[in-house]
């Protein structure tokens, strides 16, 4: 299974030669460094550890600095393991060219944190009646109507209650690759990806759609030529 680390740049839109607008997410994918090789003989599974995005060496402990020194690279901020991704050696680089337009990928990131929220925003519950006493008293408009059966004498685990919304691990599956820009280390995906701008993302080959489709032909303004998706 192929995989790489990236950072969300933002969203935009592209047009096909038929004039159809496609909402796209732009992801910065620098060269990833293989910082560890995990073998089945030693660790009971096969994987490689990838690292990306430099960080000041003064912010790392000496054991961490030594770990990156084995791969002959500077300390990195973002580190992840990818199972069953073989064929690479310690210190080797992995870039965006491992993917091609038409392939599908799964993108994992941390969703935007929205702070403390009520049940209506957090769980899409219905708002109470705005008349006949619904504005106050025993059942205010934006309050949960019931917390459970009277015979339970307790609130059962998992009841929808107010609390923190967002800032959790989210995976969007089967996003189509529209364009691969090797020169600028960019990956353009159809649709949205989790998280705010500048947030880190893990990009892997899609589990549910392993077969690629024909690349989309993009329109270029002031030109009669189509964009070559390479």
Swiss-Prot record:
GO terms for cellular component: cytosolic large ribosomal subunit. GO terms for biological process: translation. Residues 125-149, 210-230 are annotated as: Disordered. It comes from the Bacteria. Transmembrane segments: none annotated. Keywords: Ribonucleoprotein, Ribosomal protein, RNA-binding, rRNA-binding. Pfam families: Ribosomal_L3. GO terms for molecular function: rRNA binding; structural constituent of ribosome. Belongs to the universal ribosomal protein uL3 family. Part of the 50S ribosomal subunit. Forms a cluster with proteins L14 and L19. One of the primary rRNA binding proteins, it binds directly near the 3'-end of the 23S rRNA, where it nucleates assembly of the 50S subunit. This is Large ribosomal subunit protein uL3. It comes from Mesomycoplasma hyopneumoniae (strain 7448).
